[in-house]
């Protein structure tokens, strides 16, 4: 793929900002879906991450997760959807003159496809420091000294869905203020409703110099998905 076809409206957009000069890790999350988005799991974004690469300095990791199942629904999780008609885009806005203009300076595109044997693979386009790369899913592959991965992983998103439900329900009860047993409270045991749940992930390293364009170390990123029109 050297060019991407036109695609329909973006059903999901998540945004965060990060300073590459610090050991900052940030994420944005969206796990509660409308029926329309929930009906298209391959295009349903969950989180976007950016953090320093643990493999060494000079590299930053970007990640998009999608196709998760919101707790407390069925705990039967499937494999990564290999949908060639979905385009995943990681948008990068570089800081200029101390501010952001909310327009992407760099766009990393990702798309799945199958070879003649029916095996699923991922292609990434316009990766800072690597350009276009491709490889099989569920395998870490390398190009230009950077690492890439697409497949299923334990969902890193942490959320106490049971506590949230108890908190919301308490406000509907006469005389309750939300401070009830089982609700969100500081100092109380935490429950991770997404623990041991599969999430589909696209993960890629970027060269810091190419990521920032040699300018400010601060960037703002967001992710979108879109279906190819046809």
Residue ranges: model-predicted function:
Residues 27-230:
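Surface-exposed extracytoplasmic segments
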